[in-house]
Amino acid sequence: LRRQRQMCIRDRIDETDLELYQAIVTVDASTADMYLKNMKSLFMEMFKMADLVIFNRCDDNTNMGSFRRSIKAVNPRAQVGFERADGKEMEQDELLPYDVNAEVIKVEDEDYGIWYIDAMERPQVYEGKTVEMRVQVQRSPKMPPGMIIPGRKAMTCCEDDMTFIGYLCRLNHTKSKTLKRILNNEWVTLTAQIHSEYNEAYDKTMPILTAIRIEKSEPPKEQLVYF
């Protein structure tokens, strides 16, 4: 039924001379958490094509970081804003669970989703930094030689809607004591340097990794990333 309604709306737009310029979604932050817990799949569907998402009626207890990561997981291009009941914009400084100024940023298994979204939103903060994390390797014959995608599987809406999230990684003179060849779907501990490059698909600057060291690792107890 939902798909039929969506098709009906598209048909009506196609019948006019109107051009869809921007899709804006507004969300009542005071009830958003309830919908995320009880109707996540339906709730997240409306964000997939949004250009801008505004959470209104926010207060000091609003979990802005969690809401932002949930939106970015299904639609990385969407801009996400937060407003108080009086219309004033909320400050969005989020306390990160790792030291972004450390010599090596150590991302724990449960914090991968936070790092992934923050690096996407603020690539300049991570420019030139070194990161260490446990990830799963994705390889494809279609990828350029010497490239992998290290990342994690994330549940963005429900168990039937899982997405592999990660950034491209170059293997240039990468060191390893435990691996002669990196296999597809293999779990590794990756130490890499982060840089930023323009991504044509997303029309924005995105992180790209250069591997320094890769070592064989056991899978984490919880292999999925949740938002």
Predicted stretch roles:
Residues R2-I9:
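Short, small-residue-biased leader/transition segments that mark boundaries at the very start
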Residues R10, E19-Y35, L42-M44, K48-F227:
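OB-fold and OB-like single-stranded nucleic-acid-recognition modules
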Residues D14-T16:
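A general "mature secreted/periplasmic domain" signal
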